[in-house]
Design a protein with these regions (language model features):
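Charge-rich amphipathic alpha-helical interaction elements
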Residues: 1-142
């Protein structure tokens, strides 16, 4: 049973590490997404409506601004999805951590049982040796 508990702890630890890697990856992806949103917002605010240049330049700038707004909306939606994924992963991490702690407790209990069994065996051997010595002493006096 101790071997099983030990393997269980190893598996739970690996599962936890895998979730940690996914969490780190999602956090990085979210950070990049937020950075992209800020860049696009900066680009959008850089566009000024031309006072000169006519209607065609005005329309081109409006189209660019519209395209940037759509990209920002897409990035923001992507950010919301990443946040949802992150929350799910954080919950998975919490549950995996709980499972790991349970597995560690099982392993500790098994180690304690094994220790108690060894102590009982040692005591039985000591008792047996004491009896043998007692019999030997009794045989010498007779």
């Amino acid at each position: 049973m101790k071997k099983f508990a030990s393997v269980l702890v190893q598996l739970k630890t690996l599962a936890l590490e895998k979730i940690e890697q996914k969490l780190e990856s999602k956090r990085l992806e979210l950070w990049q997404n937020e950075r992209e949103i800020l860049d696009k917002q900066a680009q959008l605010s850089a566009f000024k409506n031309p006072e000169l240049g006519g209607m065609s330049l005005f329309l081109q700038i409006q189209q660019l601004k519209s395209a940037l707004r759509m990209e920002i909306e897409y990035c923001q939606q992507e950010g919301e999805d990443l946040n949802k994924d992150l929350k799910i992963l954080e919950k998975d991490y919490f549950l995996a951590n709980q499972e790991l702690e349970k597995a560690k407790i099982i392993l500790e209990n098994e180690k304690q049982k094994e220790k108690e069994i060894l102590e009982k065996k040692e005591q039985a051997l000591l008792d047996e040796n004491a009896m043998i010595l007692h019999w030997q002493k009794g045989g010498l006096h007779a």
